[in-house]
């Protein structure tokens, strides 16, 4: 019984600490447990909106090619944002596509503005 009480008490303390952290800095330490998924979840909706606004594309690309690249980035980040066992059970083709999307994200990082 004491163990259950301690666990419950620890959970309450942690929740309060995380609440205080969110109030004071806008995020809490739990977001660093799987920073990859946290960042992906943060980026995906913004990247989708960036694509919707369609305010240009890199000089060396066509608008169609740029949209395909953005789609690959979005696919990769959505896949990583899931943070579930299924992402580790995915096929080799999916992992290859995710890797390609992440590489494109890095390559075109400097073009994500308008």
Task: Please describe what each predicted stretch is.
Residues 1-114:
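Long, non-globular targeting/processing and low-complexity regions
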